[in-house]
């Protein structure tokens, strides 16, 4: 049990939003809040173009944000700031940006935010399409549940876990107390799947949610070595250096 993850093991938060989409704070504010947490790296992952309700980024705005992140990176030595996206997996299974756009980002998350009522087969087709894309590193809140509000889109968990393992796609424990998705039971049952614990912060205060995600992981006996945001600054840089996840 000595290797079970603790809050002190977390070296960065890699899913968060800014005023570019539906977040409350600028990139700079988020950077300073992450530095205040003592983090060594962070990824800015605003919503993608089809999620209009969340002010999703058209390609041109995404690339403009990318430039702003590069400038801020030169300014702040104490943290590495990476460009990313929380990209929608569309109802037909296609992804919200083309690969040539994804190639320009440091880190790509994919997520389902619409058409939750599809059949399990259709949902799995969407998730499979995302997992098999060479740029998609991780799937956010993999069941889509909101505690007390909606059950989510009911993927076939067994299939999703096999798929994640096969394609080396990371699955998220979303630390927002309304989500806690994946939950402790799932991460305990599938010990080989790589994880990341993130706050999905839409406000600087939300960075404090990390403790709920870590508590969920602890309940699921998750060891530190399964969670990619426990990597050191250097190792995380190496991990995402070539942008494309390694294909078996």
Question: Residue spans of the language-model regions?
Answer:
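Charged catalytic cores and adjacent phosphate/nucleic-acid-binding surfaces used
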Residues: 1-18, 27-44, 49-79, 91-248
């Amino acid at each position: 049990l000595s290797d079970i993850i603790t809050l002190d093991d977390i070296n960065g938060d890699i899913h968060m939003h800014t005023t570019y989409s539906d977040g409350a704070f600028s990139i700079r504010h988020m950077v300073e809040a992450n530095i205040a947490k003592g983090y060594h790296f962070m990824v800015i992952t605003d919503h993608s173009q089809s999620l209009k309700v969340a002010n999703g980024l058209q390609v041109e705005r995404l690339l403009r944000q990318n430039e702003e992140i590069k400038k801020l990176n030169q300014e702040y030595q104490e943290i590495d700031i990476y460009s990313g996206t929380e990209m929608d997996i569309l109802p037909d299974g296609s992804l919200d940006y083309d690969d040539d756009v994804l190639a320009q980002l440091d880190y790509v998350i994919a997520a389902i935010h619409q058409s939750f009522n599809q059949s399990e087969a259709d949902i799995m087709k969407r998730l499979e399409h995302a997992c098999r894309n060479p740029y998609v590193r991780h799937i956010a809140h993999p069941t889509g549940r909101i505690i007390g509000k909606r059950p989510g889109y009911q993927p076939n968990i067994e299939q999703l876990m096999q798929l994640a393992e096969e394609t080396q796609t990371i699955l998220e424990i979303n630390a927002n107390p309304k989500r806690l998705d994946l939950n402790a039971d799932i991460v305990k049952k599938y010990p080989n799947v790589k994880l990341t614990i993130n706050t999905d912060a839409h406000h600087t205060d939300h960075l404090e949610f990390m403790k709920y995600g870590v508590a969920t992981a602890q309940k699921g006996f998750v060891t530190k070595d399964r969670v990619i945001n426990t990597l050191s600054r250097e190792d995380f840089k190496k991990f995402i250096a070539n942008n494309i996840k390694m294909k078996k």
